[in-house]
Design a protein with these regions (language model features):
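Long, well-ordered, tryptophan-enriched scaffold segments
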Residues: 2-5, 16-139
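Acidic/polar loop patches that form or flank catalytic/metal-binding clefts of enzymes
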Residues: 54-58, 124-126, 142-145, 172-182, ...
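Intrinsically disordered or highly flexible coil/loop and linker segments, enriched in small
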Residues: 7, 14, 50-57, 68-72, ...
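Conserved short loop/turn motifs at secondary-structure junctions
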Residues: 114-120, 147-154, 186, 232-235
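A cross-kingdom feature strongest in bacterial/archaeal respiratory oxidoreductases
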Residues: 1-22, 33, 206-333, 369-558
Length: 558
């Protein structure tokens, strides 16, 4: 690790605790301005290829040419983001050499130009490139890359394409000490149901393509008749805005059809009239009565149980499967989500929802996990052989759990998967045995050929938004993040007395020079606001290629 001489490069607009620790141990801080990640990443890549430091052997064996990246798509409409982003001319390349040619042709990726826009010392870009790829005594360094939300949520497609290409250039991917991935540890693990039919989506884009339904835009356009909101504040989250709150107000509270009776049939008739009149009916399912989605706009409240109040499985970002056991009864009428959904489904006339407990749900979902990155079906197979439930068997792995996909060896023991896309992994030569299922992603990448797609990452797709958003006049960049002191929105923490006593409010960190200029001192109460907040109106149709660009939306009055 870092304390044993590992070189660490941190790219972050702020000197966080992690940055300070890395610097203390000889690391490098790329102190970029917000949103300029793509420029700096591609500038690093440019230095690497200009000097011939790329991992040529890895690239030769594991990178697609154009035929490889196009294969498997057939001749139909490119109607999913994966398809059209892979084969779109702005992104697709003919292979590494074509990507290199494109990279070197972009003036904005010259180190001096990228450094100027990003507000960073050009020497840091040069050092980063050397650390990541320059051979020492004829031996290439092993480089791994880790990203998180600030990186891929700010310029999602562009930043992801750029960092993927850089990873390919340095040979990071699928080998011990040479991997690339995100750092998130979200507790997830649900099995997906049927996909939304994208060809039915109203979100039309140029050509014959359609985007997945954007529920914010659909609601803003007044088309949402019923919203079943589960576990999200919605109006305050992501693209939430006062504009969205006003629309909720219009469609619910301001609609003339309001419940004024305790009679069940009268309530049903009233809500149907509201929906038929162009209004919206809202169901809110959450562990708290959230303001305003729950206590102001919801017509029906489903109080939900949370972790500790029901036994269930989870899988985190590294596919680590674990059981979280119940240790406390849920308050009042609160029920686990699976129970609420099952009762709704049965009342709607659907079969197959007769679960007795959360283990029943887990066992039914096990077979649908086969071949996935969290495949846990063989845990269930082992459990049934031993006369146990799936939860009981998984519980034997304790706090550490087991990483999916999970396989059963010939002696009946279970084996997890340390890393996906492991190009060094040796599988059974004669194929999977018993109920085991092999997935291409175990030893290859998720393309038709099993190789990586190296893509372009044009700055022009983001630069119009960035140039509009960057501070003007006396404005400052403002970032929001997650701190352990007051986690996220305070959804849970603000209800904990010992947290609130120590941190009664969220805090703002500001550079001393900026604070002095504005007369701000430690302990002051501040209001952080912006006079310039872009928000999409009711547009769901795109005709020209530029219609969904930021500049195109602004020109159209959105």
């Amino acid at each position: 690790g870092i304390q044993n001489g590992q070189k660490c490069i941190m790219m972050n607009p702020r000197r966080t605790a992690g940055v300070a620790y890395a610097e203390k141990n000889g690391g490098l801080w790329l102190d970029i301005d917000l949103g300029t990640d793509l420029l700096v990443v591609n500038a690093i890549a440019r230095i690497i290829v200009e000097n011939g430091w790329q991992d040529a052997e890895w690239i030769k064996n594991w990178v697609n040419n154009k035929w490889g990246s196009s294969s498997g798509f057939g001749q139909g409409t490119r109607n999913t983001p994966w398809q059209w982003r892979t084969t779109w001319g702005k992104f697709q390349t003919k292979g590494f050499d074509d990507w290199k040619k494109w990279l070197l042709s972009q003036d904005e990726f010259k180190p001096e130009n990228a450094a100027k826009v990003a507000g960073i010392d050009i020497k840091k870009i040069q050092t980063a490139a050397e650390w990541m790829a320059k051979p020492v005594k004829g031996k290439r360094p092993k480089t791994s890359i880790m990203i998180e939300k600030g990186f891929y949520w700010s310029n999602n497609t562009g930043n992801t394409q750029a960092i993927s290409a850089l990873a390919i250039a340095v040979g990071a991917g699928g080998r011990p000490g040479q991997v690339v991935g995100r750092a998130g540890g979200h507790q997830r693990g649900g099995q997906r149901g049927g996909k939304y039919p994208r060809n039915k989506s109203p979100m039309k884009v140029p050509g014959r393509r359609r985007r997945a339904l954007d529920t914010d835009t659909w609601t803003m356009s007044g088309h949402t008749r019923m919203a079943h909101v589960i576990g999200t504040t919605w109006i305050q989250s992501m693209c939430g805005s006062q504009q969205l709150a006003e629309r909720f107000e219009q469609l619910t509270v301001a609609n003339p059809h309001q419940i004024r009776s305790y009679d069940k049939q009268d309530i049903i008739d009233t809500l149907k009239k509201r929906a038929d009149s162009g209004g919206m009916v809202v169901i809110n399912q959450d562990i708290y009565l959230v303001d305003p989605i729950g206590n102001r706009y919801a017509d029906i409240i489903f109080p939900a149980a949370t972790w500790g109040e029901e036994t269930f499985m989870r899988a985190n970002g590294e596919r680590r499967l674990r059981v979280y056991n119940k240790f406390y009864d849920a308050p009042g009428e609160a029920k686990p989500d699976w129970w609420i959904i099952a009762e709704l489904a049965k009342r709607m006339g659907f079969d197959g929802f007769d679960w007795k407990n959360s283990n029943d749900v887990a066992e039914e979902s096990a077979r649908f996990s086969r071949g996935s990155r969290k495949d846990f079906n063989m845990i269930k197979v082992a459990a049934k052989r031993e006369g146990k439930t799936l939860h009981q068997k998984l519980g034997e792995f304790g706090t550490n759990g087991i990483q999916g996909p999970v396989f059963m060896k010939e002696d009946g023991t279970l084996e997890g998967t340390k890393r996906l896309h492991d190009t060094t992994r040796k599988l059974w030569e004669d194929g999977p045995k018993g109920g085991n299922v092999y997935n291409k992603k175990l030893t290859h990448f998720n393309s038709q050929t099993g190789r990586c797609n190296i893509q372009k990452s044009p700055w022009s797709l983001f630069s119009d938004y960035w140039n509009w958003m960057k501070p003007k006049g006396n404005e400052l960049w403002c970032t929001s993040g997650r701190t352990n002191e007051r986690w996220q929105s305070g959804f849970d923490d603000r209800r904990r007395p010992y947290i609130v006593q120590r941190w009664p409010d969220n805090y703002v960190e500001i550079h001393p020079d900026d604070a002095k200029e504005r007369g701000i001192e430690n302990g002051d109460m501040l209001m952080v606001y912006s006079d310039r907040v872009p928000s999409l109106k009711e547009t769901i149709l795109g005709i020209e290629g530029s219609d969904y660009s930021f500049a195109g939306q602004m020109k159209a009055g959105n």
